[in-house]
């Protein structure tokens, strides 16, 4: 296997945006004639950082399932308001398709896998790949930045719903399991980072993924937990309903118990093997969905 890290954009102002490609190569002992599907992985971190737990461990899992894997360190922090991360993901799709032959990738089978904040960005591209905000910026055929499908792990999909819910929550001063900050400060801070403007209705809706679902949204797999203490997950049900209303192929798995940030739920991601290891079934369900959509069987 070959592992290399590259800058996504040319220019010093974008040097922090990198990607790492994990590529299985053909050797005398490993025949790898057929192009592989590719998985572009976007970890989460509240829009402030990207956790290692949702990068290489995920890449290794999908490598073992027959994919070439790429982890993307998209823009985070003070410069990461929309549409900047959307541009990062679209650029990663372009680069992957440009290098498809070199990397032994099937350009028609490139998926996005996102976790938490990274899943928010993946959902945005799944919905907006053919919008003018991207077409005007890249001036490429729109199909070049269309993912084949997206996998959304405990995503934040409706900014207005999250804001309204945390403001109204009588328990919003308690910390979450992933942050010592009060939940109100944590969630509104994350929303301010990604929205980049005052948290009023118009601004929250402008780049909220749920507002951009259409009949052109790509097939979507979603999983989350009812008792997730970082976000309010009823929004996943609303999102799935809107996918259905637009005749978009989707699958939703809402587990009763679990924790935000579970990733692939194995010894590479848990300091103590999780109490929720039975939720690792999401990976099998996800692979089944991918196989059906991409006809990989």
Regions flagged by a language model, labelled:
Residues 1-34, 201-203:
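N-terminal cap/lid segment of alpha/beta-hydrolase-fold proteins
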Residues 50-52, 70-107, 272-279:
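Catalytic nucleophile-loop/oxyanion-hole region of alpha/beta-hydrolase
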Residues 94-171:
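Primarily recognizes the serine-hydrolase "nucleophile elbow" in alpha/beta-hydrolase
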Residues 165-212:
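Mobile cap/lid helix-loop segments that gate and shape the active-site cleft of serine hydrolases
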């Amino acid at each position: 296997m070959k592992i290399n890290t590259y800058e996504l954009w040319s220019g010093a102002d974008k040097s922090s945006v990198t990607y790492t490609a994990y590529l299985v190569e053909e050797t005398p002992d490993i025949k790898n004639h057929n192009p592989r599907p590719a998985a572009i992985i976007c970890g989460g971190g509240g829009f402030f950082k990207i956790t290692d737990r949702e990068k290489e461990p995920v890449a290794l899992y999908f490598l073992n399932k027959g994919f070439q894997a790429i982890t993307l360190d998209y823009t985070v922090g003070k410069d990461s308001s929309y549409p900047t991360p959307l541009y990062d993901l679209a650029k990663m799709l372009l680069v992957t398709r440009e290098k498809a032959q070199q990397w032994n990738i099937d350009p028609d089978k490139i998926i996005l896998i996102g976790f938490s904040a990274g899943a928010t960005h993946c959902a945005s591209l799944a919905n907006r790949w053919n919008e003018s905000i991207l077409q005007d910026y890249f001036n490429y055929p729109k199909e070049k930045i269309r993912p084949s499908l997206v996998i959304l792990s405990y995503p934040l999909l409706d900014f207005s719903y999250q804001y309204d819910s945390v403001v109204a929550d009588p328990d919003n001063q308690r910390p979450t399991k992933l942050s010592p900050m009060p939940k109100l400060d944590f969630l509104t801070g994350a929303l301010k980072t990604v929205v980049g403007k005052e948290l009023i209705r118009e601004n929250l809706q402008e780049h909220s993924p749920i507002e951009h679902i259409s009949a052109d949204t790509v097939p979507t797999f979603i999983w989350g937990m009812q008792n997730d203490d970082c976000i309010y997950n009823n929004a996943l049900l609303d999102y799935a309903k809107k996918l259905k209303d637009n005749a978009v192929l989707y699958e939703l798995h809402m587990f009763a118990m679990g924790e935000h940030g579970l990733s692939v739920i194995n010894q590479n991601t848990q300091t103590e093997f999780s109490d929720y290891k039975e939720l690792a079934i999401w990976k099998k369900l996800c692979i089944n969905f991918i196989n059906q959509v991409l006809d990989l069987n």
